[in-house]
Amino acid sequence: MISGNITAKAEGKTFALSEGGYLYCPPGSLMTFVNAQAEDSQIFLYKRRYVPVEGYAPWLVSGNASELERIHYEGMDDVILLDFLPKELGFDMNMHILSFAPGASHGYIETHVQEHGAYILSGQGVYNLDNNWIPVKKEITSLWALVLYRLVMA
């Protein structure tokens, strides 16, 4: 949830989701949701075809980013990682929030083949894409989405 409040249902369970809330539904699960307030709610919805690993399966996961363990990304004090999904072979992906303090960055330029992207939750910064520095900021920039970034304005 980016803002607002919704009521979501999946696998016979009901979830009240507010800012920072999330719900992962495994393959074959039906999810429904309705706005639970008079004002608009803003959600980030991501759907992709599941790639199974024999002998493993994902399960329904729900929570709130405010309750997740804050991990110092690659040992850096100025970059915090919040992982939404378990690090289990049944999950063929992850969603997470990276929070960058002013002046912080990855320790290297990312080069990998995984599907990757960003939705800017707050702040502004620059993103190196194919050796081009692209200005990014909240609500204006959306690189093909799989990773959520929180950039703190200086």
Label each PLM-derived region with a short phrase.
Residues 7-9, 32-35, 101-102, 124-128, ...:
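Long compositionally biased, domain-poor regions of proteins
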Residues 14, 18, 27-53, 137, ...:
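Ligand-binding loop in jelly-roll beta-barrel domains
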Residues 14, 22-24, 45, 95-99, ...:
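Conserved hydrophobic/aromatic beta-strand scaffold that supports enzyme active sites
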